[in-house]
Amino acid sequence: MRHRNGNRKLNRTSSHRAAMLRNMANSLLTHETIVTTLPKAKELRRVVEPLITLGKKPSLASRRLAFDRTRDRDVVVKLFGDLGPRFTARNGGYVRVLKYGFRKGDNAPLALVELVDKPAAE
């Protein structure tokens, strides 16, 4: 029985899954919008939301914890310099997952993942 098992396996080993979610989180925090499959998007939301909450607390310990989870200095700088202050008034719900049709090759359901308070494109 798989009652209350928390995460999706996504047909990957645990190390592959962790690396993939870390890379996707870094891409989302850098570009603020990505397109991926729907199950990956739903799992990605569980990784990114705590990172943004961490970015709202500007302490050295929070920065070190964020670097430990992302392993990318540029992402940490953006997280604490731009994204954390942008979401100070919002208590969670920083990531939006929208259904985005189906992939051409294998008909996999796609999702558009974006940050909620994204600045308007010019």
Curated annotation (Swiss-Prot):
Please list the GO terms describing molecular function.
Answer: structural constituent of ribosome
Keyword annotations from UniProtKB, A to Z: Ribonucleoprotein, Ribosomal protein
Record InterPro entries? Ribosomal_bL17, Ribosomal_bL17_CS, Ribosomal_bL17_sf
Instruction: Give any single GO term for biological process.
Output: translation
Q: Got any disulfides in this one, which pairs?
A: none
Listed under GO cellular component are:
cytosolic large ribosomal subunit
Stated family:
Belongs to the bacterial ribosomal protein bL17 family.
Q: What PANTHER family does this protein map onto?
A: LARGE RIBOSOMAL SUBUNIT PROTEIN BL17M, RIBOSOMAL PROTEIN L17
User: What's the subunit arrangement here?
Assistant: Part of the 50S ribosomal subunit. Contacts protein L32.
Name this polypeptide is given: Large ribosomal subunit protein bL17
